[in-house]
Curated annotation (Swiss-Prot):
Binding of pyridoxal 5'-phosphate, residues: R87, E227
Family to which this protein belongs: Belongs to the class-IV pyridoxal-phosphate-dependent aminotransferase family.
The protein's name: Aminotransferase TOXF
Other facts noted in the record for this chain: The genes involved in HC-toxin biosynthesis, called collectively TOX2, are organized into a diffuse cluster that spans >500 kb. All of the known genes are duplicated or triplicated within this region, with some variation in copy number and chromosomal location among different race 1 strains.
Residue numbers carrying N6-(pyridoxal phosphate)lysine: K188
């Protein structure tokens, strides 16, 4: 069965606050049965949740981000949904929730995309369909203990790159610690992100045009890089000698998300013959980097043109779109859009006929 072409839609003026797709997918878990229900499609953007649910009151929730893109042959490719299934299972365990089984997670993602397939942007458009799986404690529970019921759902929306298509200016956060070493910074929960909003808004209003994004450092020494507020940190070093390969620098941090996009970049870099270096990266070491990128599902690959450290009055500057960034960006984009072969097996073709008769 043919996948429908994109709906009539003003893709370039899309407002992410609107949700006018056809609906979302829901699954429910009850402690009484110990099982998740089969996924069902709900033709509404709203959920029915008890007001005393731990997901609302105690932050017992986790989420993921995935993207789907349309190829020139009108196929739809979903990028690494299995990796998100594995990561969300780890996040759920961290906040005392039953993990969603791998196959149920992936099937629910395919269902949500298939039944909203006409909202996957055209192949030649610079956007994608953003897929948001989330899970939370949903039944009444006043005490600080697991509730009897949980909801897993998958929402989708047409999506334009989070930070646009230019370079970013970053400010190192010095008045706020995003996560502690033995805290929850390594899992994808809303509590890691909501407190950052006011600090991000404050940074945007600073003098000299403001800052696009915050860069967080470790809470203990305030010197080692964790990640950006919205994405992972990647540095590069150009080859110093003609026969030496360039390097990709990935900060080691127990308080940062294990980024799927960063992992993908590392695999691409390895296929180019570049060296991958995973080690702690200090603020001082920013001066030795050739390029810096912010990478994530919603952000994509975005070059960072400068990083500001106010307390030492230092600004680290980088190319707005260096050669290593351009090679990584083009290669990843071509794989995700079906323009080149996917030797890594990252893209899953949409199982459209399984859900649409």
């Amino acid at each position: 069965m043919a996948i429908p072409l994109p709906a009539f839609y003003k893709w370039d003026v899309y407002d992410s606050k609107l949700n006018n797709v056809h609906g979302h997918v829901e699954c429910r878990y009850t402690a009484q049965t110990g099982y998740w229900s089969d996924p069902c499609f709900v033709q509404s953007p709203f959920l029915s949740v008890h007001g005393l649910a731990p997901g609302l009151n105690y932050g017992q929730q986790v989420y993921e981000g995935i993207q789907a893109r349309r190829t020139a042959r009108n196929e739809i490719l979903i990028f690494r949904p299995g990796a998100s299934a594995d990561r969300m299972a780890k996040s759920a365990t961290a906040v005392s929730m039953p993990p969603v089984p791998y196959e149920l997670f992936v099937r629910s993602v395919h269902m949500a995309v298939a039944l909203n397939a006409d909202y996957v942007p055209p192949h030649d458009f610079h956007g994608s369909m953003y897929i948001r799986p989330c899970q939370f404690g949903s039944s009444c529970q006043i005490g600080l203990q697991p509730p009897d019921e949980f909801i897993f759902c998958v929402f989708v929306q047409p999506h334009i790159a989070l930070h646009g298509h230019g370079s970013l200016r970053a400010l190192i956060a010095e008045d706020f610690d995003r996560a502690a070493t033995r805290g929850t910074g390594h899992v994808k929960i809303g509590g890691n992100y909501a407190p950052v909003i006011r600090w991000t808004q404050s940074a945007k209003k600073e003098e000299n045009g403001g800052w696009d994004v915050l860069l967080h450092v470790d809470s203990k020494t305030q010197t080692r890089i964790d990640e950006f507020s919205t994405s992972a940190f990647i540095g590069t070093k150009y080859a110093e000698e003609q026969n030496e390969p360039p390097q990709i620098i990935l900060p080691e941090s127990a308080a940062a998300i294990q980024s799927i996009t960063s992992d993908s970049v590392a695999w691409l870099a390895k296929s180019f013959g570049w060296n991958i270096v995973k080690q702690p990266v200090t603020i001082d070491e920013l001066a030795s980097l050739s390029e810096v990128m912010a990478v994530g599902t919603a952000a994509g690959l975005v070059p960072v043109s400068c990083i500001r450290h106010n307390s030492t009055n230092r600004t680290f500057e980088f190319p707005s779109a260096g050669p290593m960034y351009r090679q990584l960006k083009e290669t990843l984009d071509n794989i995700q859009r079906g323009r080149s072969s996917d030797s890594f097996g990252w893209c899953e073709k949409l199982r459209y006929a399984e859900f649409v008769q």
